[in-house]
Each structure stands twice: as C-alpha cells, then as structure tokens.
Amino acid sequence: MEDAQNLDLVSLSKQSKDLGSRSRGNGNPLSNEELTKGTFSTSNLGMFGTHAFTAIIVPPQSGIIALGEVKKEPKVVDNKVEIRDIMYATLSADHRVGDGAEGAVFMKEFSQLLEKPSRLLL
C-alpha cells in the first residue's frame, strides 16, 4: 500500500482488503512491482488459528509484523484476574535500518493503539 501514512482509516481498510484478497488469488493478481517495492509488511496467520510465529523479511523490505490469533486468556488487572482478548505480535526487523530499541518503541505504540483503537481516529 503506497503512502499509507496519508490515508484515512476507511481508505486503509479498503486498500488492505483489496491487497489481501488479491494476494490470495482473488481478482487481479499482485504485480511483481507491488510485491517488491514495499518497505514493511504484515503477516496475519492468526486467521488460521496460529497462536504466535516469526515472519521472515522479504528484501528489500525493512520489517514485517506477524499477527497471531486473538484468544481469551486470564490477565491480572489491578490485582484481579480478568478474562481478556489477547493477541501475540512479533516484529522482525532489518538491523541495518534501525536498532532493536526502535523496534521496541514501535511495538509498544502498536500495542497501545490496539488496546485503545479510538486513538486511530485522532
């Protein structure tokens, strides 16, 4: 997806659905240019019931985030056990582009956005 930082949430959703559908062989297949000009990818094996996994970077991309399934798990919140929806996400990054601390900051922000998705609308 090109210039994702300039798209609103509705446009991001539409383009994401289109690219995902085309990557699975529905409609016009993705071109070689679309497959190779990216800088960052998302891999969602959670929809197949995969709990957690490590995705492999496809050059020349700088990183890929792997998303696992959402499962209900016990979580301690304010010293009480609550059942919460939990999803594991892992980041694979090319350390020639950035160091691990930058990846950790990215993952923290990503987690905070998922915990409070209304922040995506700001």
Q: Where do the PLM segments sit?
A:
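C-terminal catalytic/motor cores of large multi-domain enzyme assemblies
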Residues: 1-122
